[in-house]
């Protein structure tokens, strides 16, 4: 074979090898991209059952077992996926979107069920923390060893009525309790327009805020996910935290999260580090389980932010939850606080602010204020 023939043959072989390599590379890239996409897909919550108001949401694609959340919420810096150390990172923050705008909500009576029909979605979102008996620091409790609880979502059936984005409330249960124990309060919130994410943990990670924070992460991811029913319906700039007993301890600790606008620990408040928003520190005057010392200490520790110590004299550690066909006095006060600070309900502001505030002049309450002159 001549020299020119050899050169021509080598060129042809090189071209064939390059094409084969490129095809393999493209195939690998497509497979990798498909895997990444599948891992990042979170099934959108399903609509509620109108007759009972509840539904079990399908979470196709929500990876993770034993507390690992790899693959939840997609890829990129906004994902929760990975290890528990990443639990505090939020999904894409979209305060306004195609479906709603942030603004003041219409006035409503906080002591009555709100104007919106509600839906409850069970077992949604990622697993949050370790199960009771699963080992590790601060197990989340739940249905038994190795079982890691998820969340219950309480929301208005119709989203963004009047084009308004829904503020978010994250909830923490008391010891041994699930969201069903607090259903009347959490449904009250939803009937007023709040989207409430409540950990199903019976121990709320034994008083640590992880489940409450992971709940925020998840709803923010849903707000950024076009396949989610919550897509661009949430006001991600107004997020409240509240919880009872051990959940109040978790609320106090979660208050340092920069995304939380206001917090209301109920019968279990502790001194709050890195507080950056108004706080209502509630206790029952007849509470012999945790008493009111923690709430008083939490108020003393506040320096510049608005804070209220609110003791309702006639209730104990559980009787504040009485419903009897209408919300309890405490429900109404907590709901009013959330409406003022998350919905810009200025009509309810005099309930709390000023020396002659509504609660201040109510003999059923013992009120102490800090930085709440106006």
Spans of features found by a protein language model:
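Short beta-strand element of the alpha/beta-hydrolase
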Residues: 163-174
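Gly/Ser-rich "nucleophile elbow"/oxyanion-hole loop immediately N-terminal to the catalytic nucleophile
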Residues: 160-165, 207-249, 347
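Short amphipathic alpha-helix adjacent to the substrate-entry channel of hydrolases
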Residues: 180-199
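N-terminal cap/lid segment of alpha/beta-hydrolase-fold proteins
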Residues: 95-164
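Active-site-adjacent alpha-helix of alpha/beta-hydrolase-fold enzymes
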Residues: 275-344
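Ser/Thr-rich, Pro/Gly/Ala-heavy low-complexity intrinsically disordered linkers and tails
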Residues: 19-98, 130-142
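Short glycine-enriched nucleophile-adjacent loop
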Residues: 248-258
């Amino acid at each position: 074979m001549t020299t020119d023939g050899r050169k021509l043959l080598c060129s042809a072989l090189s071209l064939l090898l390059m094409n084969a390599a490129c095809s393999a590379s493209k195939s690998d890239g497509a497979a990798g991209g498909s895997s990444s996409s599948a891992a990042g897909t979170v099934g959108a919550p399903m609509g509620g059952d109108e007759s009972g108001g509840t539904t079990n949401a399908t979470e196709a694609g929500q990876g993770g077992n034993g507390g690992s959340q790899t693959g939840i919420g997609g890829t990129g810096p906004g994902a929760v996926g990975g290890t528990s150390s990443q639990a505090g990172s939020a999904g894409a923050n979209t305060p306004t979107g195609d479906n709603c705008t942030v603004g003041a909500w219409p006035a409503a009576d906080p002591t009555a069920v709100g104007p919106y029909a509600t839906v409850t979605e069970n077992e949604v979102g990622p697993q949050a923390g370790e199960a009771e008996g699963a080992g590790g620091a601060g197990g989340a409790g739940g249905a038994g060893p190795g079982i890691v609880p998820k969340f219950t979502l309480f929301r208005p059936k119709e989203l963004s009525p009047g084009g308004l984005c829904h503020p978010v409330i994250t909830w923490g249960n008391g010891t041994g309790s699930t969201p069903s124990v607090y259903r009347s309060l959490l449904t009250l919130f939803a009937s007023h327009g709040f989207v409430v994410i409540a950990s199903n943990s019976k121990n709320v990670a034994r008083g640590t805020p992880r489940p409450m924070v992971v709940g925020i992460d998840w709803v923010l991811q849903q707000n950024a996910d076009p396949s989610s029913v919550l897509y661009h319906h949430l006001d991600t700039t107004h997020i409240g935290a509240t919880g009872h007993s051990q959940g109040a301890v978790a609320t106090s600790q979660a208050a340092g999260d920069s995304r939380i606008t206001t917090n209301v620990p109920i019968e279990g408040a502790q001194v709050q580090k890195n507080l950056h928003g108004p706080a209502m520190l509630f206790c029952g005057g007849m509470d012999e389980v945790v008493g009111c010392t923690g709430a008083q200490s939490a108020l003393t520790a506040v320096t510049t932010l608005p804070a209220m110590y609110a003791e309702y004299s006639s209730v104990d550690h559980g009787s504040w939850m009485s419903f009897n066909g209408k919300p309890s006095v405490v429900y109404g006060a907590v709901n009013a606080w959330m409406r003022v600070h998350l919905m810009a309900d200025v009509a309810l502001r005099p309930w709390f602010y000023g020396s002659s505030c509504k609660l201040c002049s109510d003999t059923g309450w013992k009120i102490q204020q800090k930085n709440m002159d106006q």
